[in-house]
Amino acid sequence: MIIEYFPGDAMPLLGRYQEDGLSEEERELLDVANGAVAFIYFTGQLYRFDDFRTSRPSGHPPAPSFVQVTELLERIRREASSAEEKEILLAVMDALAFIESSGQKKGLEEYLRYWETDTLPPVIAAFKTDSEAETWLDEQPVPPYGARVLIGNQYHSVKRSRERRDPGFLPIPTIEEFIGSHLEEGLPPAVAAFNTKEDAESWLANTPLSTRHAFITIGGKPHLAVCQERVNHRALYPLRRAEQ
């Protein structure tokens, strides 16, 4: 299995099984499995996970904290018709074991809570400039391939792999898509209104990081205020960004 392809293979496969006559409880268990794959990918841990799989002995026991999820995946795997699907499902079970053995069960639980809410995805790092981001990436002993980071308040995905150095980062329109979807659905009432950007920034600086996001107005114009708790980062985005 090519590890870089694992998330793109596993998440759609699990989603397909969720639509295939499972009970509500079973669908929720597959949500945990799907979230585990996404958590590993978007936090830049694919290569660490790959190394973990390589070093694991065959016939290893399931992760104790995820017994129900693993039992369901094993049942689905037994019934799967293709060797490729069986391999992917085994890798998903290994993903759960990796998360538990590396002490990241709480991190996964927090990530799953993000999945259940309408908010922006978390990032693992935030930088003011491209050069700061490149320096940080050069210092990583293992490329955090797939991780989300902020560079100048813009979402980027880490694309440096073990085989390829460039491109280091790829910009992704996460903010624009989030704003665009809310403009289509209709904005919620603003939680605060300010005359100037300075007033709004002062308010945001004292807003709990757990707020995640809020819609406000500055000079009568709608803005999105975002807090990234993990990296202690706050930012304001004018809603016109989605139209650019």
Residue ranges and their predicted role:
Residues 126, 131-244:
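N-terminal accessory interaction module
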Residues 2-12, 29, 62-70, 88:
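Short amphipathic alpha-helical heptad-repeat segments
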Residues 65-69, 76-82, 95, 102, ...:
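N-terminal intrinsically disordered, low-complexity, charge/repeat-rich segments that act as generic
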Residues 14, 49-76, 112:
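Extended non-catalytic scaffold regions that mediate assembly and binding
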Residues 25-28, 62, 84-86, 204, ...:
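Tandem-repeat/low-complexity and Cys-motif detector
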